[in-house]
Amino acid sequence: FNIMAADQFSSLKRPSGAQDAIFADRNKVTKTVDMQCRRLDTLLPELVAQHGFARPFLKMDTQGHDLSVCEGAGDAIGRMLGVQTELGVRPIYEGGAGYRAMIDWLEARDFAPSAFFANNKGHFPLLVEMDGIFVNRALVRD
């Protein structure tokens, strides 16, 4: 895990060489640490057993790693009532999925956009990233 100069940038991914100059001093690796990662499809049954929920909502903020989290959900993604994800518009992390790829991935699994909103007003007028909320068409009534 990459610990960045500014902790809000810490990520499994390394900083993008194409990141905007305004991030360069804050989004640089100062230390790496080992950590355990688990796939959501193996973790979700444990969480359901522990907390007893029936309609999970997946909220992610994994600093460029959201698509990998969704892929790690396997078939369990279809049990999610909805998903909230960060959608990268400008590159911050190497290998981070852009907003179009993330939207396409979710729509291919029958998740419909419900809302998009900028998650950081400090970079107006150029959008860096936004949050997107998607609902599972199979589980939500029109």
Regions found by a protein language model. Give the residues of each.
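Conserved acidic-Pro-Pro-aromatic motif
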Residues: 43-142
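Glycine-rich adenosyl-binding loop in Rossmann-like folds that engage adenosine-containing cofactors
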Residues: 1-38
